[in-house]
Amino acid sequence: MLALGKLLELTLTDHEPAEKTQVTPKGARLRWLGEGALEVRPAESEDCGLDLLLSAGIHGNETAPIELLERLLHGVANGKIKPRARLLFLFGNPVAIRKGERFIEQDINRLFNGRHELSSGFEALRAAELEQFARVFFSKPGRSRLHYDLHTAIRGSKIEQFALYPYKEGRKHSRRELARLAAAGMEAVLLQSKSSITFSAFTYEQLDAEAFTLELGKARPFGQNEQVNLDKLEERLIRIIEATEPEGESSLDGLQLFSVSREIIKHSDSFHLHLPADIENFSELSKGYLLAEDLAEMRWVVEEEGARIIFPNPKVRNGLRAGILIVPDSGQRLG
C-alpha cells in the first residue's frame, strides 16, 4: 500500500508525508496537496475527461462517508481500482474529524460562496482553503466536472439516503445526473430553488460542476457504521472512477423528487420550533400546523399540500436556516 493511499491515517495523526507524489501499480499518480487533500491523475492515455471531486468530513462526526472515501482511495493506491477520471479526495474539517465532533467553532458547511469572508477562526480559513482546492482542480477547460459532498445526518430520516441538488439561475437540473443518483442508491432528491452557502452549492454555482450533497444515513463513530449500507453508492463511484458506467441511463424509477417550498429562518433567541426533538427528516406535516414562532409575532404555518420537513434544528445561530419545508415535485423542469 502506497503511503499516500492512507490519507485518513495521515489526517487522523496530523502527519505530513515525506513523499508528496507516488505512482500506483496501474500508473495513476497520487499527489498530496495539503492536509486532508489528495489528487489522483490517471495515466494520460487512460484519461476519460472527467474531473471528480469527492469530499467528506465537512462535519467531523460523519464517519461513514469518510470510511467510504478511504476504501476507494485504498483501491486506487493498491491497483484494484484503475482510475480513468481525474480525482480529488478532500476531508473537509480535519480538526473536527480528529476530535469526533460535528465542528469546533462553527459549521463549515455554512461558510462557502464567500460567507467565510464575513467570519473568522480556523473553520472560516478552512472553508476558503477548500474553495481554493476545488477552484484549482476544476480549472482545466474542456472537461466534465462532478462533485459529490458526502454526509450523514444528525437525526433519523423517513428516507435514509437522499441528495440535495443546488440551484443556479438559468441552469436546469440534469435528468442524466438524477438517473446516475438513482443508480447509486439515492431514494430522493431535493431540487433547490435558491443560492446556498454549502460546499456543493459553491462548486455548482461558481465552478460549473454538477454538484450534490449526499445524505447517507445516521452519523455514527468510526467503526460503527454497519447499519449504513453504501454498497450501491460505492459500486457506482467505482464505475464513475473507472469510466465503466452503462451508456444511455435515464431511468428515474423509484426516485422521489422534492422542491423547496420555504426555508425556516431563525431570527432571534425567542425562536421556537413546534416539533418533537426526535422528529425524522421527511416527516409529513398537515395543513394548518403551526411550525414555528419568533419575535414580532412571526409565525410559520403549513399551507402546502404534502409538506414535509427536513433538517429541523432550532439550535442554529440567529440568521441561519432552522429547517426546510419541502413538497413533492413532478420533475417537469428537468433538463
Curated annotation (Swiss-Prot):
Pathway: Amino-acid degradation; L-arginine degradation via AST pathway; L-glutamate and succinate from L-arginine: step 5/5. The keyword Acetylation does not apply. Transmembrane segments: none annotated. Coiled coil: none annotated. CDD domains: M14_ASTE. Transforms N(2)-succinylglutamate into succinate and glutamate. This is Succinylglutamate desuccinylase. It comes from Pseudomonas putida (strain GB-1). The lineage of its organism: Bacteria, Pseudomonadati, Pseudomonadota, Gammaproteobacteria, Pseudomonadales. The gene is astE.
